[in-house]
């Protein structure tokens, strides 16, 4: 497949969800079969280099990219969910937000000690969710093999929070 200018498939909506925010809408990329496939393929090629045993995707848009990446690599996908969404025993990680805190969970038996885990998500902003996801993975005894994103908002400096990890983003703003 030919290389695409992925940026042109992202719709930018100013002042959403509140004034001063420039929202990057990925639904315009997802609805275009060629662009969606090319984006997933580009992420697959990068993730393949880290030789993961599993892909982890944070709720909810991480599912849209993480699951097809796992499928293409022939490996499993583990969803990282908000509290109360998983029916079995879970492992959790709480992290601080600007105004409060949030918690992420995985099933306790989903990730095994020693496994290499790649995190795939739609967006790297401040790095808070991804950092918490990495801590959650490490809490299970597994290793973070790398992190891949469709979009990175560089001005929010999320990479600084992820120092020590291999980070890849397809589109940078």
Swiss-Prot record:
Subcellular location: Cytoplasm
Broad class of enzyme this protein falls into: transferase
Biological processes, Gene Ontology terms: adenine salvage; AMP salvage; purine ribonucleoside salvage
Main location: cytoplasm
GO molecular function: adenine binding; adenine phosphoribosyltransferase activity; AMP binding
Keyword Glycosyltransferase: yes
SUPFAM superfamilies in the cross-refs: PRTase-like
EC id: 2.4.2.7
Record-linked CDD domains: PRTases_typeI
CC terms in the record's Gene Ontology section: cytoplasm
Pathway(s) served: Purine metabolism; AMP biosynthesis via salvage pathway; AMP from adenine: step 1/1
Reaction equations catalysed: AMP + diphosphate = 5-phospho-alpha-D-ribose 1-diphosphate + adenine
This protein's UniProt keywords: Cytoplasm, Glycosyltransferase, Purine salvage, Transferase
Family, per entry: Belongs to the purine/pyrimidine phosphoribosyltransferase family.
Binding partners and assembly: Homodimer.
UniProt cross-references to HAMAP family, sorted A to Z: Aden_phosphoribosyltr (MF_00004)
Known function: Catalyzes a salvage reaction resulting in the formation of AMP, that is energically less costly than de novo synthesis.
Annotated protein name in UniProt: Adenine phosphoribosyltransferase
Organism: Desulfitobacterium hafniense (strain Y51)
């Amino acid at each position: 497949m030919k290389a695409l200018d992925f940026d042109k498939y992202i719709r930018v909506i100013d002042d959403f969800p509140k004034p001063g925010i420039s929202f990057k809408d990925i639904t315009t990329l997802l609805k275009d079969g060629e662009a969606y496939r090319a984006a997933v393929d580009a992420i697959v090629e990068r993730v393949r280099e880290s030789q993961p045993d599993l892909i982890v995707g944070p709720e909810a848009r991480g599912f849209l990219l993480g699951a097809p990446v796992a499928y293409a690599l022939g490996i499993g996908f583990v969803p990282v969910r908000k509290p109360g969404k998983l029916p079995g025993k879970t492992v959790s990680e709480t992290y601080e937000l600007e105004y409060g805190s949030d918690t992420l969970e995985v099933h306790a038996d989903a990730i095994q000690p020693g496994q290499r885990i790649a995190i795939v998500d739609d967006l790297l902003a401040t790095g808070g969710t991804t950092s918490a996801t990495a801590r959650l993975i490490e809490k299970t005894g597994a290793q973070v093999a790398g992190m891949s994103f469709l979009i990175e908002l560089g001005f929010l400096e999320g990479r600084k929070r992820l120092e020590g990890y291999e980070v890849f983003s397809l589109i940078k703003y």
